[in-house]
From Swiss-Prot:
UniProt cross-references to Gene3D superfamilies, sorted A to Z: Isopropylmalate Dehydrogenase (3.40.718.10)
Top EC class of this enzyme: transferase
Name of the featured protein: Phosphate acyltransferase
Region (Disordered): 328-352
Naturally occurring in which organism (per UniProt): Geobacter sp. (strain M21)
Keywords: Cytoplasm, Lipid biosynthesis, Lipid metabolism, Phospholipid biosynthesis, Phospholipid metabolism, Transferase
UniProt-recorded Gene Ontology molecular function terms: phosphate:acyl-[acyl carrier protein] acyltransferase activity
Amino acid sequence: MRVAVDVMGGDNAPHVEVEGAVAAAREFGVPVTLVGDVEKVRAELARHDCKGLDIEVWHASEVVGMHDSASDAVRKKKDSSIRVAFELVKGGEAVAVVSAGNSGATMAAGMFVLKRMKGIDRAAIAQLFPTVSGKTLVLDVGGNVDCKPIHLVQFAVMGEVYARFVMGVDNPKVGLLSNGEEASKGNELTRETSALLREKPINYIGYVEGRDIFNGSVDVVVCDGFVGNVALKLSEGLAEAVGKMLKAEIKSSFLSQIGYLLSRKAFNNFKKTVDYAEYGGAPLLGINGVGMICHGGSNPKAIKNAIRFAHEYALKGVNGRMAEKLNESFPGDAREREGAQAPDAGTERVAS
């Protein structure tokens, strides 16, 4: 089961992607196909010891830039590395795609080439957040800035399946992100969504607040892509700021430096917990295949872990489990009664 890696999309492509892919092949034994300019890719591979590693190169002559229109780029740049990578999955040459390129284009390519799963109107980008007791899955974190209640319900069902079969949570607690836990809080979107969620075969616990993402009280947090992207960027900025503040305090006095030396292991463990590279990337849920969206500035470690998680996702057959749960949650023509309306692939407004 090969993983196709878009090696031309990231801020530091193809150097970072190739190094991360080589590490994944060496450490985890994952077969990888590097998709991009064959000459540049082979030049990067020459810098590594690839003897005995299952690494293939697939040529793609075009690149989707970070500022390209997502849907236009996917349709017009038919030989772009990201579209070719998804075409490999469609053709059975790979089981998953990993990309650190334009997130909107990655999402659009996944939907355009592989199409949405039956019962899904909007694919969603999910992200794991560190908590005091493990991890919380938040979705959507940027795939769809405007959502209807039915979309959030679909996100909840997909997130529940992911938490159960990927995160290993027996009975995942699903919460709807709002400005308070009381039923009277929220807006029209959250109130309508909450009423629908209570009818679904999931462990829905009601409204949760932003702080609950990190305190371990909920396993899956559902929101629209606008709110989710703000939460994601806020958490990234906070983690970076806290790191800088700690460094400044440690350097402020000799006693602080002694204290740091004595507590270095604890600091390193904390750094590892909040390091996005440990999580690799954000899975794109709701397409007929596996897609992993990485941060544009990902380092080799992040790419390596994204490849590992994408491979595990495919091996566990999570999409099949999602299809079963969707059929259970939306029997017959229930989706039509609840106001589902599927747009054309690639037309969603995406938060970058």
